[in-house]
Amino acid sequence: MHGRQELPYHYAQLTICTTHQLLRFYHAFDNLIIDEVDAFPYAANASLLYATKQAIKENGGCLYLTATPGDALLREIKSKRLVVNYLPLRYHGHLLPQIKVRLAFGWRRRLERQQLPPQVIQQLQETLREGHRFLLFIPHIADLALVEAALRHSFATFRFATVHASDPERLEKVQKMRDGDYDFLVTTSILERGVTFPEIDVYVLGADDPVFSSSALVQIAGRAGRAQSRPTGRVVFWINCNCRQVNQAISQVKYLNRKGQRLIDGVSFV
């Protein structure tokens, strides 16, 4: 169910809907599963939280799913009002790709001359030589045109596009990436979650920009390594200087991998 659906609702044992549709229900569901609970529009939306509570039967249950719980959920967990369980391994049983940090001093100054740092170009070329595709995340929409111009010089024979939240062709470009029509996409954080492209590498230029929260960086890193055929994709963050959100993202991935390794080794954990 969603806002543009024309067919009327009818009872079913399983209902898949947007969280806004929960406003239509009262004590209707035995169990609710809310995916990406930390993401817009659900996060920090009091009306949707109220709708969730109203839609569940009095003795019903609710399961929140997220890779990056926000502060409110963490407080609920710490105070033992929520029970937490970890799924540190993906379906293929491999650890999450580790985040690697590389320095790219003055990349914006180079960008003004329609250039990118040599180490960035070399890394992207290496991925393409290996026969892999990639996502290149950048901080701001205003950076897209300059990054595209810089990439055209070094990647003239490759197929790529830029994409952002207001792009009228966003869905078509994402589908072309899925279909293999693009070798890479240059994107803002709009593709940080909710999309899966097999066997890709992930790069972030300017990962120390304040626009990227630690949770956003974890989600971005999570675009890599999702396929059974290549579960170890490369993740590289280029920064101007050390910053808290990058360090927090690295720590969270390492924490989950420690839990994942214990699971692989057959050791129980809490």
Residue ranges and their predicted role:
Residues 1-10, 17-24, 139-142, 160-172, ...:
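Conserved helicase motor
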Residues 11-15, 28-31, 57-65, 132-133, ...:
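Loop/turn-to-beta-strand initiation segments
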Residues 22, 38-42, 70-71, 143, ...:
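Residues immediately C-terminal
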Residues 27-107, 113-115, 119:
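Post-DEXD/H (motif II) to motif III coupling segment of the RecA-like Helicase ATP-binding lobe
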Residues 29-36, 184-186, 192-208, 218, ...:
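A short beta-strand element within the Helicase C-terminal
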Residues 56-72, 214-217, 221-254:
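Conserved segment of the helicase C-terminal RecA-like domain
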Residues 81-144, 148, 155-160, 263-264:
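Conserved interdomain linker/interface between the two RecA-like ATPase lobes of SF2 helicase motors
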